[in-house]
Amino acid sequence: MAFQLALDALASTSHKDPSLHPVLESVHDSLTDSLQTYPWMVPQDLQPFLLKSGIPINSFGSSPHPHPAHKTLETHLLFTHWMHLCTQPSSVLFMKPQKFMKLQRKNKFFQHLHNYRLTPTDSVRFPSTSPHLPNTPFVFMHDALMYYQPEQILHLFHQVPQLTNLFCSLVTPPESHFTHLSLMPDLYTFTLKGQTLHYTPEGHSAGSYNQPITALSWLKINSILSPNLNLSITILESWGPLHSILIQRGLPLPDPKLLVRSLPPFSRSPDPETDLVSFQVPKSVELPQATFLSQPLRHRLVPESVYNALFTYTRAVRTLRVSDPAGFVRTQSNKPEHKWVTPSAWDNLQTFALLNCPLRPNVVYHVLLNPLQKMKLYFSQHWRRLGVIAAPGLFCLSLLLRSQKWSLPLPKAKSISVFRRNLLLPPKPHRPPLLPHPEQMLQEFKLPWHRPPPKGKRNPFLTLLINLLHIPREICAGIRRYPSYYQSIQPKPLNPIQQFRNQLLAQLHTLPLPKKFLSILPRARKDIPLLPRMSFTTVNLPLQPPMWLAIGASLVPELAFLLSWLSGDVDLQTQHDIYHHHLHPENFTLSWTRTPYLALAPSPFLPYAHSPLPPLPVNSSPLFPPPPPLPPSQPPLSQGPATQAPSAQPTPGEPLLAPPTTELKPESSNPNNPNPSSSAGSNPPPKSSSSDNPPAPNKPTPTSSSTTPPSPNLPLQFGSIHSPFLSDGQLNYSALPPPQDPTNTTLSLLPEPKPPTEVQSPLMADPTCVGPAVSFSSLYPRDFFPNTASFLTRLRLSPPTPLPMPKNNCLLTAVAPSLHINPHRLWTSLQEVLPDSLLSNSEIDSVGMSTDLLTALSHLFNFQAVVHSERGDILFGLQSAKTVIHIYHTNGPPAHYSPPPKIIGSNSPPSSQQHPLEQAALRFKYQGSHLPFSSFHSFTTSVQHAKNLISNMKNGFDGVMSTIEPSIRHQPGHSPREKFIALDAMIDLARPKTVSMFHLAGFAGCGKTKPLQSLLSTRPFHSFRVSTPTTELRNEWKKDMNLPASQAFRFCTWESSLLKQTKILVIDEIYKLPRGYLDLCILADPCLELVIILGDPLQGEYHSTSPHSSNHQLQSETTRLLPFIDHYCWWTYRVPSHIADLFSVPSFNRSEGHYQMAVRTADSYTPGHFNLVNSVATANAVIQLGFPATTISASQGVTHHNRVTILLDKHSRLLSPSNTLVALTRSTVGVEFLGDIGSLSGTNNSSDMFSRAIYRQPINLSSSFPRIFHLLPLLNKPISRRSTRLIGSHSPIFHNPRLTNIHLPPHIPTSYSQDFVVSNPIFQGQADPRLDTHFLPPTRLPLQSELLPAQLSQTTKPTDSFTNNTPFTPVYPGENFENLAAFFLPAHDPELKEVTRRDQTSAQFPWFDRPFSLSCQPSSLIAAKHSPSQDPTLLPFSIPKRLRFRKSDNPHVLSAIDVLLGNQLFFNLCKAYRRNPTHVGPFNPALFAECIALNDYAQLSSKTQATLVANHSRSDPDWRHTAVKIFAKSQHKVNDASIFGNWKACQTLALMHDFVILSLGPVKKYQRIFDALDRPPHLYTHCGKSPADLSAWCQTHLTGQIKLTNDYTAFDQSQHGESVILEALKMKRLSIPSHLIQLHVHLKTNVATQFGPLTCMRLTGEPGTYDDNSDYNLAVIHSQFDMKDIPVMVSGDDSLIDRQPPLAQSWEATKRLLHLRFKTEKTTHPLFCGYYTGSAGAIRNPLALFSKLMIAIDDEAIHDRRLSYLTEFSTGHQLGDALWTLLPESTQIYQSACFDYFCRHSPPHEKALLSSFELPDSVISKISSSTKWLSKNAFYALPSKIRKAVIASRHSSSFPENPDVSQLEFELLQSFQF
């Protein structure tokens, strides 16, 4: 890091190159070696992977290769990795000889090459085959291990005893362990098909190959175990899909920790270490599974950085909408480093983020709690865990109370005595029965399992057990029967005195004494006192509940916590753990544990053995028992095509136990075992294939039936060996296959597939009918109307069943009155011919009866029915029937049949409104298909459309007939012009007319014309005429119809057709005709009844060649005729399938050969090919050269049967999608492009559709025609049959998909907030000061920082311009505004000022239909008006003057002159600010964060919410940040330069990506703060200043000397690379982060627009446009002059110097390097930013203000603009009489006229602005409420109170530069201490 800082310090000095010389010397050898070893052109996105893998590649490779990264990996493996491993004599297997020779030259130990031809491709790869196996200790197998099984490798080690190490390269994707989608799609892709893995390197399909899917098992095993030999497997290296594996003889020694028992416990491991391997995958996290759903792991892997960023984002925004996570994901999904993520994973990620965004960790951080509060908080958080821990203790405590003799002591009166008498005697002692000893109880019960303990000892366990158990009292009573126990119970012994006393009293009581005497004798108790006495004793309340109560009480805690766990909330600790586990998943790692592989017996390494294997010992037994046989239903695995061994492959999965190599056969088929019973009784080890007579390789054995083909899943095997050598052309050792064993039944063990169960339809399962299902007309052949009796039925067998009458029986009730038959009789009759399944089903129950039943009724009762439906009259029944009934059908919903209304008098039933030709057109078929329309439509003409067209035709603006043949004399009224004049007069009196019409629409070449021509050839349509837009199309109609010469008048062009009359009019290519032509044709022909129009709305519209035509102002025919399109034919007969496939259109013209046969480029014109060009002039030039040609537009509708040539020129890039579609679809063979191949580059400056066609990329018509394509009702195949079946609410064939299938997104208002998911609350403080962002597009919101301001606003309020001085007003000479305005505008022709280029005229001086009242012309003609909506030529004509383009798409390279000049300008800019150019200030992160918040505020407040929503594309992640959209600025700029001026180029605005604005905008605001801090007082910049500030500065600093002003010509375009250097140096001076500086330089040197790449010019719209222009201007001024302290004013390209300074000495040298054009002027009345300035102050230019007033008055907008103009006027008015010293004499009358107008027309509250007194609140309220529009200068000129009131009165600011932002910048400058 220190060296890098030192080099950066030397960047601008001459010492840097010598300092870097050692660095260059150190990398020279490495770079040279890398270029020689890896010379291939590795893609840029794969280089980081290779470098991370330790491969020293370079980015200077020049050799192309179809898969360079794989070639680099292989080269590194062979010449770096293997080169160091080969330390002994080695052999190499499966390598081309040339590659081996190169390897041998690098390392002499590579001695032998052995190749074996195992597959057909090996004969090409290997010119010869080795006759023996390798015999060296080291063997290197090149890219073949994936085709081998462990048994085969074991066989190789058996055959070659010298072999110790086998080094193998394995190519297999490790992620195939769990998915079929690559994790490195740029490096490789693969697919899984059955048991085969198809591997494609780097998208190179020709280099793809197949390999067994079980090849992955080599990465999952660590050893191969067999009875005689064990092999160990080690993964040495892994480079993505390439792995280096070492297979060694023997196993490694066991871990010493398992063997040495004397090791300390911490060093001794009881189990072996886990053999875990991991592989390189992108950094990702695994999303959790959805609840109770299974989602594949591959679709749950998302990038770690995206997940963490999205997690933070969803919790950082204040309001999260439903679309915000998806918008954030969209900003990341298109990044190249995320190609491996699947669309399902992105979907799961945004869904997961959306659904889990409300979750927050339920934690608290209470650090100031006392111990009691901490205990309380701990218990509240962990009470459930504490309860669960205490529950077992409570359970044991309940049982302990039962077992232990615990009691509760209570006080009780023992005795009460008085006068030596007991009033309350103590209770007699009662001895509870004692329990026997446990041992004694067991002895008395004499249990068989009890053994008495030795004498003197007791069983402690049994004693404790019985003491814990409570023995009920009943059991105790039974135990008393044992005398041995009760004899052991002795009473408590008494002392001798008590014994003597008791004996004496007992003797006295036995004497014959009187009772009274005996009553006074003391008994055997204590003496009773004389005085009253009460004694107490303690009574123990036993705590011994019953058993059931004790057990129930013990279970209460457990049940309570179980219920709490099931139904209660999760405890906080568990919530915390689940939250972090669920929302912060660990990084995904692709790893697994390797396990041993058991191989019971080896299988041949090759399909032929060179030497027999040594026999195994007889007493040898396998290490593991043999596995059970495979189930017979499991098919063998398929093998790979290259170097694949023939042995059977194991079951896919983990390699645990290998299957035996011998084939399983029945015992009777074994020729070596004649005694099946004897062999069945023994269990010998499996026999190895290495015997003296090796068996033939395994082959699929057929079954006993010779007709059964072999299974296609069985592996292909080779024959046995007949010769040890192969000839050069031979593939392998092949021979005739051995005879097959006819008794082998291996394949017969496979289960036979069961035939699928046939599900019968209700009709076939109906028991009331018999026979096959046939149509009703076949079963009952009669003359039914077409397509009415084609429904399926069967022959009725049983008599009518009493089916109930359905509730939807309106068909029967509609037919019954006309037939005079009861509906129930009709219902019964239907049951005689139709099965019950057709009469009782869900259709009849839900939607009603169909016309199928009406056909059946017509057969039964011999009638025909006319059904009057909404789509016309439809006939049902018998054509020959005499009885005709009428019924009516309405679609509803619900659909309904009804009888005809009653006939009154002799009136017939009401006639149908159907056109008489409609039925004929609907029934007509051409080659078995109907015309693609549903019904006739009623079209009502628009007289306004017709009048507009005929007026333009009469004047010659549209069409040519009115202007041709001027010299020919016609009879009066018969010339074309006179006829059009007469037609125009007729249209003036015409009324709207309605005719029938149908529209045939479809893709180009779909066959609209041929079927219609056949229809017109029929008799009903013979009276027709055809109108075409071109003569070429008219000639095609003539040729195809082939009518007699007398009928040629029926084919005419569109103008001559207006002068003819027929009943039927056919208009071909309607959309190529002028708007209103259809209306004019109908109104001009009184005989017209039917109109048939053909056209494709996708193939473009009519465009008038006259700039004076107003036809384009009418509504487009594509949208006007859209409701009449019933079907859009989505197929083509003309376009070749190669081209049709680009549009996803089915084509009947199948292409032959390669795609280039249909679409290709050419170097010259091809004879016989028709040429399509862009313009008429080009077509005439090509025709003059002898080649047939026409314009692309004129070729619409024409079919060419040869290839057409499309001429490309610079206009091809501007072709519309409609024209390019026409060009690509004209030929039945194909197209070829000739000319400007740059139009096919696929960039912004090319034709998109042509580019996609030449590169065979799909063309999305939805994006090419976004306004109309989604509205077209696509018909995917021709209509072969029209359904006349009516049922339900609609007819299925005429269902309009436009109404249901297409759903346009609804308009969402900006205030819509119902899609909020999370709305985070505001903690503490007041309302959030940030602006709302919920209306921003989802892709814009992640770019918004939403930082809160860190510094509080404590600055004082800005002072107004009011003063307390004595008010004074200037003296005006007096001038009437209206009188001066009447003669201000000179009489002139505004069209002379317009510019005409390429037959297009500008419209900057519109005058037609413009109001005017002040003078003889509209006042808007004073200056050019720029209106892009009204002037389509504005931007194209202005581009040459406003933009400067690069010659190529390569980035602009900064030259040495740019660096030199940029540094010179930077030094002079620092001199202007009095700065040290070498000083670099520290970066202030806090201030920069404030600037980010301020920039966000400015972006949200400077435009309305509707504007931000409308500009949602600016945050589109698919929009490259270097791409800029250029558009014209709409303005009516009125100043001294534009008044009475000519055409002027507009100002271009650059629309940049939001990323650029939000990233670099804070940088410019950060710089602006430091510039304001450093700016000396004599420097003035107008940014953020009001006119009052300008006037005050002028009064302070300007003098009365002659001023020097300058305004540059094309200032923005004149700034080249030096401006980029200047801006980068300005940012480096403030230590702006380097990535932002690099971003700025990258943008300036890589800007691309829709018109082409731009140079390093200034773009209006880039961040900091004004500041950078002002700094550039100021740097140029200080480079030109020696300014010192001369006052200077700068504002963009405008500047003013107080007096003439001396020139700088270096100016002449600097001037030659600049590209600026100066417009310097010396004057005493300088004009700066529209204000005349001087020592007296500043005043608004009265000439411009007067002109603006005139324009506003004539535009009737003065009421809205008057306050703005008055505010600008007040700045100079308040100067008093001093203002006259600032104005030139020629402008003083306009100042007086403006004052006259304001005095007479402004209301009093507005005129208060002219006063110098402070405005009262009432006036401020009136001004703010009446303000609708304010200019920027006017807004700044308002007092601060009014500005705040105006802002508060508006819901959202719409000022181009919010003045609050300048105020906040000023506050930041005051708040931060520098």
Swiss-Prot record:
Residues 619-635 have a biased composition (Pro residues). It holds the Pfam family Viral_helicase1. It comes from the Viruses. The keyword Transferase applies. InterPro entries: (+)RNA_virus_helicase_core_dom, Alphavirus-like_MT_dom, DNA/RNA_pol_sf, P-loop_NTPase, Peptidase_C21, RNA-dep_RNA_pol_alsuvir, RNA-dir_pol_PSvirus, Salyut_dom. Residues 972-1129 form the (+)RNA virus helicase ATP-binding domain. SUPFAM superfamilies: DNA/RNA polymerases (SSF56672). This is Non-structural replication polyprotein. It comes from Kennedya yellow mosaic virus (strain Jervis bay).
